Curated annotation (Swiss-Prot):
It comes from Rattus norvegicus (Rat). The modification N-acetylalanine is found at residue 2. Interacts with PXN. Interacts with JKAMP. Interacts with STING1; the interaction of endogenous proteins is dependent on viral infection. A zinc finger (RING-type) spans 27-68. The keyword Methyltransferase does not apply. Membrane-bound E3 ubiquitin-protein ligase that mediates ubiquitination of target proteins. May function together with E2 ubiquitin-conjugating enzymes UBE2D1/UBCH5A and UBE2D2/UBC4. Mediates ubiquitination of PXN/paxillin,thereby regulating cell motility and localization of PXN/paxillin. Catalyzes ubiquitination of Salmonella type III secreted protein sopA. One of its GO terms (cellular component) is mitochondrial membrane. Residues 79-110 are annotated as: Disordered. The gene is Rnf5. This is E3 ubiquitin-protein ligase RNF5. SMART domains: RING (SM00184).
Length: 180
């Protein structure tokens, strides 16, 4: 017995306070002292503003937050304790709706012609071919120009007939796409 009293702080310890006169009931949603307390049919205690908000945010699934049993405005019982200043039923009044707070927009500064897309870049294209394919056809990505007759290695002469054929096919394909 003495060991049990030492574990929970003795007869005057913090765990003995729960059964005493200063005991309070806690809401099972906000875990604070229940204000305008109501008890569900399944026996769980809530603040009426907390339970009302719970029921309003889940109109299609009205269930007890603890045990998931069916719950509604009609299935809760208000608690009236000693020293209660408000003897009226808390279910009859709806808690006030909180005011919305809009934060001020951030100023990014600088010129942004198409707005700030967060690092997103848009490329216009038709089908699977964006119009940027001309940069690869005309070697715009290559920083150095080759001189006439420069050999790039075995099998890659500077003016091969494959380059001309591919350029012709690319231009033909582009105009074919425009004609459709």
């Amino acid at each position: 017995m003495a060991a049990a009293e030492e574990e929970d702080g003795g007869p005057e310890g913090p765990n003995r306070e729960r059964g005493g006169a200063s005991a309070t009931f806690e809401c099972n949603i906000c875990l604070e002292t229940a204000r305008e307390a109501v008890v569900s049919v399944c026996g769980h205690l809530y603040c009426w503003p907390c339970l009302h908000q719970w029921l309003e945010t889940r109109p299609d699934r009205q269930e007890c937050p603890v045990c998931k049993a069916g719950i509604s405005r009609e299935k809760v019982v208000p608690l009236y304790g000693r020293g209660s200043q408000k003897p009226q039923d808390p279910r009859l009044k709806t808690p006030p709706r909180p005011q919305g707070q809009r934060p001020a927009p951030e100023s990014r500064g600088g010129f942004q012609p198409f707005g700030d897309a967060g690092g997103f870049h848009f490329s216009f294209g038709v089908g699977a071919f964006p119009f940027g394919f001309f940069t690869t056809v005309f070697n715009a990505h290559e920083p150095f120009r080759r001189g006439a007759g420069v050999d790039l290695g075995q099998g890659h002469p500077a003016s091969s007939w494959q380059d001309s054929l591919f350029l012709f096919l690319a231009i033909f394909f582009f105009f074919w796409l425009l004609s459709i």
